[in-house]
Structures are given as structure tokens and as C-alpha cells.
Design a protein with these regions (language model features):
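Short amphipathic alpha-helices and their capping/turn segments at secondary-structure boundaries
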Residues: 1-5, 36-43, 119-128
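Acidic (Asp/Glu)-rich catalytic clusters
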Residues: 1-10, 41-46, 75, 96-100
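Active-site mouth loops of central-metabolism enzymes
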Residues: 18-34, 59-60
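Active-site groove signature of glycoside hydrolases
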Residues: 41-60
Length: 224
């Protein structure tokens, strides 16, 4: 399907998180990373990947020449067209966009986590680097569907990582205390314009920042 509409659909994917152990050296291994890309090409049934993103690698990867040599190599082979980075911090993003061939930054940004707008957005816009916003609804908080009695399955990161025990706490509820966030959500509901959901307001607020290229909310089912 994707191959037949390649002139209308841009394919973006991530790579690197499957490196085990998840250490920087894996990101410098051309053969290893190329094998991941080859598998993605096979899985997606496309001839090239429009955007390959490094998936939240160890911090030292962002400043290493080896990283960019590996990515430029994949571009030269025609297996990817562009590359970018999914980051956990603004400092990591700023390090990435120092490099001229970085085309995108994927970063957490929402009403509860606004730091990227303080500095990153301006520089990214100047350098014409796309901003892809992930976790725009703060792991579902900004849907307005949760309350203090809400519970999550044992294998849901909103259960086991609520305090950052498994990985960066910012990846779950944007690092905001759950109960405190519920209070803020109630205040937001009180100022919602008629006919607009909290999810719609939250996504629109993000897109009002002209540095933002696209927002990628998560969905677990067709209704979402």
C-alpha cells in the first residue's frame, strides 16, 4: 500500500531503542543500524524511508561525529532520505540541531510541559528544523477522562512509571504529579469554549506555536 502512494504519504519511523544493551556504541555501528533500516524497509514495503529518527539514545550519541557519519552513510545509500532525533531534553535537541543535516526533532510538549517553547522552538525555526510533538495529551491527562479513582493495567507505563521508576519520568504524564494535574485539568475544563473538547483544545494550543510541524497523539483503539 505505502509503495503505491509514496508520492502522497511520507513515512517516518524510529530506530535504536532495540539495541541491547542500550549503549551509545550501538548507534555508531553502521552494519547494525543498516540492518534495522533494512528490516523497516521490508516491514513497510517501501524503497526508502522519508524520515529516520534515532529513538531517545544515550545522551553522548547526540554530540558524537560517529552518529552523524552513520546517518549520512544511510542517506548516501538511498535507504533513508532524511534523519532526525527523538529526544528527552531540550539540551539534547539543541545539540542535535547544531548539525546541518538534522531535519527534525521529536520532543514532548504540551500544556503541562512548555520548556521547549522557551528556546528550542526559536532556534529550530531559524534552522528550518521540523518540530514533531509527542505526548501532546500528557499520557491521556489532557483528554479529561481521568479522575482520582482511575487505574491502569500493570503493564501500562502510567502504572509502573508514574514516579519515573522504569525510565524518564517526563515520558509519563509529562512528569506532572497525577493528582495535581487532575486539579489543573478541572480548571481547564471550566474555560473550554462551547463545542470543543479538552483534547481538541490541547492539540490546537500546540499547533498555535508556528515552530511546530506536526503533533502525534497516541491512540489505543479506533474510537481514539
Amino acid at each position: 500500500f505505502l509503495k503505491s502512494v509514496s508520492d502522497r504519504i511520507y513515512v517516518a519511523t524510529k530506530a535504536g531503542r532495540q539495541i541491547n544493551p542500550h549503549v551509545a556504541e550501538g548507534y555508531y555501528d553502521k552494519a547494525l543500524m543498516e540492518s534495522y533500516v533494512d528490516q523497516s524497509l521490508l516491514n513497510l514495503n517501501v524503497e526508502t524511508i522519508d524520515l529516520l529518527q534515532m529513538h531517545c539514545p544515550p545522551t553522548e550519541v547526540y554530540s558524537s561525529d560517529n552518529t552523524f557519519e552513520m546517518l549520512d552513510y544511510l542517506v548516501s545509500k538511498g535507504k533513508i532520505q532524511n534523519y532526525g532525533f527523538s529526544v528527552q531534553t531540550v539540551d539534547e535537541a539543541l545539540e542535535c540541531i547544531k548539525r546541518p543535516n538534522t531535519k527534525s526533532i521529536q520532543v514532548i510538549f504540551n500544556i503541562f510541559r512548555q520548556k521547549p517553547a522557551e528556546k528550542l522552538f526559536k532556534i529550530a525555526k531559524e534552522k528550518k528544523v521540523a518540530i514533531i510533538v509527542r505526548v501532546p495529551l500528557a499520557s491521556g491527562l489532557l483528554t479529561g477522562k481521568f479522575n482520582k479513582d482511575s487505574s491502569f493495567a500493570p503493564d501500562d507505563h502510567r502504572n509502573y512509571n508514574i514516579n519515573g521508576d522504569a525510565f524518564d519520568v517526563g515520558e509519563t504524564f509529562s512528569g506532572v504529579n497525577f493528582n495535581k494535574a487532575l486539579e489543573a485539568v478541572d480548571e481547564l475544563k471550566n474555560i473550554l469554549p462551547e463545542g470543543i473538547t479538552l483534547s481538541q483544545l490541547s492539540l490546537k494550543w500546540i499547533l498555535m506555536h508556528d515552530a511546530v510541524s506536526i503533533v502525534i497523539p497516541g491512540a489505543k483503539n479506533k474510537d481514539h
